[in-house]
Design a protein with these regions (language model features):
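Histidine-dependent nucleotide/RNA phosphoesterase domain, centered on the 2H-phosphoesterase fold
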Residues: 3-204
Length: 204
């Protein structure tokens, strides 16, 4: 089956969407143990840690997408997945962005295939008429924490260098909806919902 889609994609005029690879639960369970170690480091309470349900590798960010664009985008993502064979990936190491603004886990394995899938997901958005950010070389990263202000991420990155997770086979591409916090409660995180998934390498 080439597409795994729920019956309803939207409930209002637009959705905040991105394409992603979603690691399976046994893989994120390994990472959760590593994050527990990271959160015991000095200063960890000053970071905003992302919840395990939100862990993903973003391939392309589309922003707000109008309802009438979603079918075309979905068809193009299905084609992108179909043209990409399944590949092996593992969570491995990590780094930071923005001089202490974000901490992330990296990837090992067939990163070239992941980069190719990201390029195809980005192209799908452009061909569907979405306004995309300026193209940059893809950096595989899974965001673990963000700093409310620039902090010294050195100890966290150093500890992450020791992390090497088990590999898994990436078999599908997901279209994910980001539901931003609305309650105003401090620390509330976005909720992520896969609204479409397409099997890699499928012929149908």
């Amino acid at each position: 089956m080439a597409a795994i889609m729920p019956g309803r994609l939207w409930d209002r005029e637009g959705m905040r969407l991105f394409a992603a690879v979603l690691p399976p639960q046994d893989i994120t369970a390994e990472l959760a143990l590593e994050v527990d170690r990271l959160r015991r480091l000095p200063g960890a309470d000053g970071l905003r840690w992302t919840g395990r349900p939100g862990w993903h590798f973003t391939l392309a960010f589309y922003g707000e997408v109008a309802e009438d664009v979603v079918p075309d985008l979905s068809a193009r993502l299905a084609r992108a997945a179909r043209h990409t064979d399944p590949f092996e990936l593992a969570l491995n190491g990590g780094g930071q962005f923005g001089h202490g603004r974000a901490l992330w886990a990296g990837a090992a394995g067939d990163v070239d295939a992941l980069r190719l899938l990201a390029a195809r997901a980005e192209a799908a958005g452009r061909k569907a008429g979405l306004r995309m950010e300026e193209h940059r070389r893809y950096q595989a990263h899974l965001t673990l924490a963000r700093g409310r202000e620039a902090v010294d991420m050195g100890p966290y990155v150093e500890l992450l260098r020791e992390f090497a997770g088990r590999s898994w086979r990436v078999t599908d591409l997901a279209l994910v909806r980001s539901n931003l916090p609305r309650s105003g409660v401090r620390g509330e995180q976005p909720r992520y919902e896969a609204v479409g998934r397409w099997v890699c390498g499928a012929s149908g």
